[in-house]
């Protein structure tokens, strides 16, 4: 009986952890991450910036579906939401504390490396960031969120993609360099198994730099991506 309870508890913890993993990435064709969306209970999405600040949250009306007729629109969440009070640490007083029973913590004002005020945990998932001593192109950016890791191109890389995401989880990301056609240099070239091509500077003016292929929404290695062209 005891072993059964332990097993059930472990299964529940895994299910809860997976429920707050990275669900969606909104990224432009130039490789700029606009927001990272984490799934909570009741189809709630929590949007966090690449440097660990909460942007907004709400109910995902397109949960489980690939296409979105109104991309990025969240419906108001009617459940219980709590906030930190004025008596809490100055780095997170007034910030959201829990959404639908999922608790959110932040790094306190005493945290080093510029972490103060950034999201520290969402449910059981811990967030980590690149420290101030690391490369200037990505210091302060998110390093890991739960089981998902993030790497970034450094200031030593080609300037067309310096500071842009290099990998998200198991998906590697490449870009067109400064040596490529001016109409698409710096734009996404590949993400995971998906490749991107664009009209060049020799094409009709209205087409230059526009994508030749690639859907606006795609599931890649378990994460939904919204590409903004």
Language model features by range: what are they?
Residues 24-229:
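Repetitive, compositionally biased segments used for assembly/scaffolding
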Residues 1-23:
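Bacterial Sec-dependent N-terminal signal peptides
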């Amino acid at each position: 009986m005891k072993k059964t309870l332990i097993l059930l508890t472990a299964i529940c913890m895994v299910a809860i952890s997976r429920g707050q993993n990275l669900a969606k990435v909104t990224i432009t064709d130039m490789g700029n991450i606009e927001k990272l969306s984490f799934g909570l209970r009741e189809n709630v999405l929590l949007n966090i910036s690449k440097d660990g600040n909460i942007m907004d949250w709400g109910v995902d009306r397109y949960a489980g579906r690939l296409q979105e007729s109104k991309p990025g629109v969240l419906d108001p969440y009617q459940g219980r939401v709590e906030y930190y009070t004025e008596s809490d640490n100055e780095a997170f007083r007034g910030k959201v504390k829990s959404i639908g029973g999922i608790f959110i913590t932040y790094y306190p004002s005493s945290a080093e490396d510029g972490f103060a005020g950034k999201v520290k945990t969402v449910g059981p998932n811990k967030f980590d960031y690149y420290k101030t001593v690391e490369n200037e192109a990505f210091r302060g950016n998110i390093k890991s969120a739960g089981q998902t890791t993030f790497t970034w191109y450094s200031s030593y890389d080609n300037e067309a993609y310096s500071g842009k995401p290099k990998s998200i989880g198991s998906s590697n990301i490449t870009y067109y360099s400064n040596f490529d056609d001016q109409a698409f240099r710096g734009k996404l070239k590949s993400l995971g198994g998906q490749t991107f091509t664009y009209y060049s500077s020799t094409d009709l003016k209205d087409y230059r730099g526009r994508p030749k292929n690639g859907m606006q929404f795609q599931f890649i290695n378990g994460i939904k991506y919204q590409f903004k062209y």
